[in-house]
């Protein structure tokens, strides 16, 4: 069945585009990534500068918009927040965040538990993923991006 309706892409098509592009800048040098972030008019906080792992999500969204002409805010947000998550994530954003977290190339300690939680649904998957991330970063004494904490609190609020 055709998924394109008018000029709007369905969630499956948008997930495909965001999934292909979410790591488009991951292998680029940090200086190249930061240049794209600046070119897109985004400002990095001091914390984001210290957390190099978030560069590729920010630069990836910038690249998708500036070089590929992608204007769909949901696709851009799915790329932009696939590492940190954020409060108020759309369905597409949650799908890309969790798909990245449980992809076949992931081999962290609790990956099988994480995959099982995602199989239960988005809400259990998001709760487990964010709890795991915050706990793991805290255990290592590493900084936790405020968007991740906000996402965790948002998921917690939605659980009731």
Label each PLM-derived region with a short phrase.
Residues 1-6:
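Single conserved hydrophobic/aromatic residue that forms the stacking wall/gate
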Residues 135-160:
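Charged phosphate-binding loop/patch that engages nucleotide di/tri-phosphates or the phosphate backbone
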